[in-house]
C-alpha cells in the first residue's frame, strides 16, 4: 500500500470524524479507527499472484465489520417493542404464564400502535415524507427472525377503514431494514428519533420506558398474576426486569445516540406513584374494557395479601381473623370495588398491596392503640405471662417483636442503601450525541473501565455475593438459618376479650390518623408529619413503606382513607360538631 496515496486523502470519516485511512484490497479507502468504507477508491495493483491484476473483492471479515458498524434503519416504536419483549421474557422466567406475553401484552401493544396511529391503521404516521415501511398495514417478516416476534395476528378492534391480515401464523414484528447512507439520521440513531421527541398532538400518549412497565403491570392485572406493583418494581431494582438503561437489550445493529438518549436512557429508579399513574393513563388511552373480576380466591384480594404481609413482618397468624373483619366492614373486599374498569364513568382505582398493608396497620392500632404507652403496658403483661407459662402457647409481646424487627429492618435497609450506592449507572455501551462523537465516547468509556480495574486491584477484589432466587417474600422467619424468633404462632389471648360468642379487642380507644380531609383543588387527602405521630406508629409505617418501596406519606394516606370508611359515623359527628362551632363563633 502506498503511504503517499493515503496521505493525499485528507477527508474526515463520516462515522467517527477521524483522519486515518487505509486501502482495502479492492482499492477503496477505509477508516482504520472504525473500519468505515467510503465510496472513493484508488486503483490498487496486486502482484502477489498474477502481475497487473486488480482484486475485485473485499475480505469477508471487513465487509461484516462494515455492515455491523452501519447498523439498521429502525424506528422508536421498534425500540419500545424490543424492551417490552425482553420485559415479558423476564416475567416469564419469574413464573408468569406465557399467555401474558403471547396474548395479553401483545394485544395491548398492538392496540397502542393503532391508537397512536403508528401501525394497524389506514393512514399511519409518516416520517419526513419518507415511506415508513415498518408501519404498513401488511407487515412483512424481518431480519430479526423470532427474537422480537411480539406482535401476532390475534384480533384487535380495527379503526374505520383499517384492514388487517387474518391468518394465524407466527407473530410478525416490524421489519428492520439495513441502514443506507441517505437515510442515516445525524441527530439520532433511529429513523424518527428527532420527530418522535418533538411530536406533540392533543390526545396522544407517547410511549416512554416507565410506560412499558405500566403496560406490563396492566397485563399482570388482567391475568390476575401473583405479582403486585411493588413486587414488579422490586424485581426491577434487583435487575431481573429490563428498565434502567433498557437500550442495553437492543441488538448491536440498532445504533442509539442523539435524541434516542432522551427517549430510552433511564437513570433513575421507578417510582410507585409514577408507574401507577402511567398505568391508569395507558388504560384510559387504550380504552380498555373492564378487567376480569378479582374475587376472594384471587391473589390480589385483600384477604390473601393481608396474610402474605402478616407473614412478611413476622406478626401472629391470629391477626388474620381481624383483618378479614376489617375488610368486610369497610367493603374493600367487594368484587366491584377491587376490579379495575378504565371506561367506567367513575373510574375506581385500587392499590391492592398498599391497601392490604393499611388494613394491617389499622388492626395494630385497634389492638395496641400505638400511642407509645398502651403497647408497652400490654408487653409487660405478655412478658409476665410467658415467664409463668413456658409450656403453653406464648402471648404476643409487642416489645420483643419491635426489638427483633428493628434489628432486621435496620440491617435490611443498610444493605439496600449500599446496593443502591454501588449500582453502576453507566453501561458498557456508551451513549453519544452523534456519530461524530462516537470515538470519543468509546475512548472515555474504555478509560473509565481501566481506572475501575486499577482501583479494584488496589483495594482487593471483594467476594461476589451469590444472587438469591426471586421470591415474593423479602424477609424469611421460618428458615433454619434465620437466627431470629418467629412470632407467627403466638397468641392474641391477652389482647382480646369475649363478649357473648364474639371476641372484641381489650383496648376500647382509638385515635384517627386524620381528623379533617382537604377539599381543595390540590386533591391532597391528608398530610403526614412524623413529629405529630407516635414513634411506634412511625416505625410500623416505615417498615411497610420500605417493603412496598413507597413513600411513608402514601401509606399514611391509605390508612386515613380506610379509617374514614370504618369510622364513617365518627367522621360525620366530627364534621357536624365543627360546623356547630363555626355557628356559635358568629
Swiss-Prot record:
Modified residues (N-acetylmethionine): 1
Region (B-reader): 40-68
Keywords from the UniProt entry: Acetylation, DNA-binding, Metal-binding, Nucleus, Transcription, Transcription regulation, Zinc, Zinc-finger
Swiss-Prot/TrEMBL GO biological process terms: nucleolar large rRNA transcription by RNA polymerase I; RNA polymerase I preinitiation complex assembly
Transmembrane segments: none
Principal location: nucleus
Keyword Iron in record: no
Family membership noted in the UniProt record: Belongs to the RRN7/TAF1B family.
Pfam families tied to this protein: Rrn7_cyclin_C, Rrn7_cyclin_N, Zn_ribbon_RRN7
Annotated stretches, region: N-terminal cyclin fold: 74-259
GO molecular function, one term: zinc ion binding
Region (C-terminal cyclin fold) residue spans: 260-370
Residues found modified as N6-acetyllysine: 438
Region of interest (B-linker), residue spans: 69-73
Written domain comment of the UniProt record: Although it shares weak sequence similarity with GTF2B/TFIIB, displays a similar subdomain organization as GTF2B/TFIIB, with a N-terminal zinc finger, a connecting region (composed of B-reader and B-linker regions), followed by 2 cyclin folds. The RRN7-type zinc finger plays an essential postrecruitment role in Pol I transcription at a step preceding synthesis of the first 40 nucleotides.
Chain sites annotated for binding Zn(2+): 13, 16, 31, 34
Function: Component of RNA polymerase I core factor complex that acts as a GTF2B/TFIIB-like factor and plays a key role in multiple steps during transcription initiation such as pre-initiation complex (PIC) assembly and postpolymerase recruitment events in polymerase I (Pol I) transcription. Binds rDNA promoters and plays a role in Pol I recruitment as a component of the SL1/TIF-IB complex and, possibly, directly through its interaction with RRN3.
GO CC term (a single one): RNA polymerase I core factor complex
Subcellular localization(s) per the UniProt record: Nucleus, Nucleolus
Positions of the UniProt region annotated as Disordered: 158-188
Protein name: TATA box-binding protein-associated factor RNA polymerase I subunit B
Keyword S-adenosyl-L-methionine among record annotations: no
Amino acid at each position: 500500500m502506498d503511504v503517499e496515496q493515503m496521505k493525499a486523502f485528507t477527508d474526515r470519516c463520516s462515522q467517527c470524524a477521524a483522519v486515518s485511512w487505509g486501502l482495502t484490497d479492492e482499492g477503496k479507502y477505509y477508516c482504520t479507527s472504525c473500519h468505515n468504507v467510503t465510496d472513493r477508491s484508488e486503483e490498487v495493483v496486486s502482484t502477489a499472484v498474477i502481475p497487473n491484476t486488480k482484486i475485485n473483492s473485499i475480505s469477508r471479515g471487513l465487509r461484516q465489520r462494515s455492515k455491523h458498524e452501519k447498523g439498521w434503519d429502525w424506528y422508536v416504536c421498534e425500540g419500545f417493542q424490543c424492551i417490552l419483549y425482553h420485559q415479558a421474557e423476564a416475567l416469564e422466567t419469574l413464573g408468569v404464564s406465557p399467555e401474558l406475553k403471547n396474548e395479553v401484552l401483545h394485544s395491548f401493544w398492538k392496540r397502542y400502535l393503532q391508537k397512536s396511529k403508528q401501525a394497524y391503521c389506514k393512514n399511519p404516521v409518516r416520517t419526513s415524507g419518507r415511506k415508513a415501511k415498518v408501519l404498513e398495514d401488511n407487515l412483512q417478516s424481518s431480519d430479526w427472525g423470532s427474537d422480537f416476534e411480539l406482535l401476532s395476528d390475534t384480533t384487535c378492534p380495527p379503526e374505520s377503514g383499517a384492514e388487517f391480515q387474518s391468518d394465524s401464523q407466527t407473530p410478525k414484528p416490524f421489519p428492520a431494514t439495513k441502514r443506507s447512507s441517505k437515510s442515516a439520521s445525524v441527530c439520532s440513531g433511529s429513523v424518527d428519533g428527532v420527530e418522535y421527541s418533538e411530536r406533540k398532538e392533543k390526545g396522544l400518549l407517547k410511549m416512554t420506558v416507565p410506560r412499558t412497565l405500566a403496560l406490563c403491570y396492566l397485563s399482570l392485572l388482567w391475568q390476575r398474576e401473583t405479582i403486585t406493583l411493588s413486587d414488579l418494581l422490586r424485581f426491577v431494582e434487583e435487575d431481573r426486569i429490563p428498565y434502567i438503561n433498557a437500550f442495553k437489550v437492543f441488538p448491536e445493529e440498532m445504533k442509539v445516540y442523539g435524541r434516542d438518549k432522551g427517549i430510552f436512557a433511564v437513570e433513575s429508579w421507578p417510582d410507585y406513584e409514577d408507574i401507577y399513574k402511567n398505568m391508569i393513563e395507558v388504560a384510559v388511552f387504550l380504552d380498555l374494557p373492564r378487567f376480569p373480576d378479582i374475587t376472594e380466591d384471587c391473589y390480589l384480594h385483600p384477604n390473601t395479601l393481608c396474610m402474605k404481609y402478616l407473614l412478611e413482618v413476622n406478626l401472629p397468624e391470629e391477626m388474620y381473623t381481624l383483618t378479614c373483619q376489617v375488610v368486610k366492614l369497610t367493603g374493600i373486599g367487594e368484587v366491584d370495588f377491587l376490579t379495575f374498569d378504565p371506561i367506567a364513568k367513575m373510574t375506581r382505582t385500587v392499590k391492592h398491596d398498599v391497601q392490604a398493608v393499611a388494613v394491617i396497620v389499622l388492626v395494630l392500632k385497634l389492638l395496641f392503640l400505638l400511642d407509645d404507652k398502651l403497647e408497652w403496658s400490654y408487653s409487660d403483661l405478655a412478658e409476665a405471662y410467658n415467664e409463668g407459662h413456658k409450656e403453653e402457647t406464648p402471648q404476643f409481646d409487642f416489645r420483643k417483636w419491635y426489638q427483633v424487627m428493628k434489628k432486621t429492618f435496620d440491617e435490611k435497609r443498610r444493605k439496600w442503601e449500599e446496593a443502591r450506592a454501588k449500582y453502576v449507572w453507566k453501561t458498557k455501551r456508551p451513549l453519544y450525541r452523534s456519530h461524530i462523537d462516537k470515538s470519543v465516547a468509546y475512548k472515555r468509556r474504555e478509560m473509565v473501565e481501566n481506572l475501575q480495574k486499577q482501583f479494584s486491584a488496589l483495594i482487593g477484589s471483594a467476594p461476589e455475593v451469590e444472587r438469591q432466587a426471586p421470591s415474593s417474600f423479602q424477609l424469611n422467619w421460618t428458615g433454619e438459618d434465620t437466627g431470629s424468633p418467629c412470632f407467627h404462632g403466638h397468641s392474641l389471648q391477652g389482647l382480646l376479650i369475649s363478649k357473648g360468642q364474639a371476641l372484641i379487642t381489650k383496648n376500647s380507644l382509638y385515635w384517627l390518623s386524620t381528623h379533617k380531609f382537604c377539599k381543595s383543588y390540590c386533591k391532597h387527602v391528608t398530610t403526614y408529619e412524623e413529629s405529630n405521630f407516635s414513634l411506634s406508629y412511625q416505625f410500623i409505617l416505615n417498615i411497610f413503606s420500605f417493603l412496598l418501596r413507597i413513600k411513608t406519606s402514601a401509606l399514611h394516606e391509605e390508612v386515613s382513607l380506610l379509617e374514614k370508611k370504618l369510622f364513617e359515623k365518627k367522621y360525620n359527628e366530627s364534621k357536624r360538631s365543627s360546623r356547630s362551632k363555626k355557628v356559635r363563633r358568629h
